[in-house]
A protein has these predicted regions:
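Non-heme di-metal
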Residues: 1-205
Length: 205
């Protein structure tokens, strides 16, 4: 078997079939941001949620936009490291979900509410905890190729430190008697499904 970093010129000769199986599993559960009618949550945002709740949700969703774009870039870089068609396909499929689906889903509510992206960016820099998370994200992804084995754990670190803790915050709007932003949380559930699947796929390597 060719080493994982050695180019396999024979498309269709799958030396890492688990990568192809993962790619197909992700495609089987693929979805789009257009499918989630977050505009149905507009009343909750504008009339039910408190101003602090809404601001926290706005900045969290925009933080997720930044994270998803960075994570997508990470997976595209992984694809270039392992030149086997099945691995490239799997990594590219994850990157597509991150950059073309997840990021645009998180941005969708800001678009519905006509929130100025520059205003959100300013808020992210004035809220210390968000500024620190964005700084950590930049540090983790700044020089992936310097240590490839360590970098394979990069996405897991981003998911655990930056994403899942904030997923819990958003999910709290559907707990303890609350039933707010239902459509938004449906999309969050889809993202979590993709995240768990990518964890399984990454561990297979």
């Amino acid at each position: 078997m060719l080493p994982i970093e050695t180019h396999n010129p024979l498309f269709g000769k799958y030396l890492y079939p688990q990568a192809k199986a993962f790619m197909e599993s992700q495609q089987d559960v693929s979805w789009s941001a257009q499918e989630i009618p977050v505009e149905d949550d507009k009343h909750d945002y504008l009339s039910v949620m408190s101003i602090p709740q809404r601001r926290l949700t706005d900045t969290t969703l925009q933080l997720f936009v930044e994270i998803e774009q960075r994570v997508g870039e990470v997976w595209n870089e992984f694809a270039s490291w392992f030149p086997h068609s099945e691995i490239e396909g799997a990594c590219t499929e994850i990157a597509r979900m991150e950059k073309s689906v997840h990021a645009f889903f998180y941005q969708k509510m800001s678009d519905v509410l006509n929130i100025d992206p520059s205003t959100v960016a300013e808020n992210q820099q004035t809220i210390a905890v968000l500024r620190e998370k964005l700084g950590l994200l930049g540090q983790i992804t700044s020089n992936l190729s310097a240590n490839k084995p360590l970098s394979l754990f990069t996405v897991a670190a981003i998911e655990q430190v930056l994403l899942f803790s904030n997923f819990a915050m958003l999910k709290s709007f559907k707990a303890k008697g609350h039933n707010l932003i239902k459509k938004t949380l449906t999309g969050v559930d889809y993202v979590i499904q993709d995240r768990l699947l990518s964890c399984v796929g990454r561990n297979a390597y």
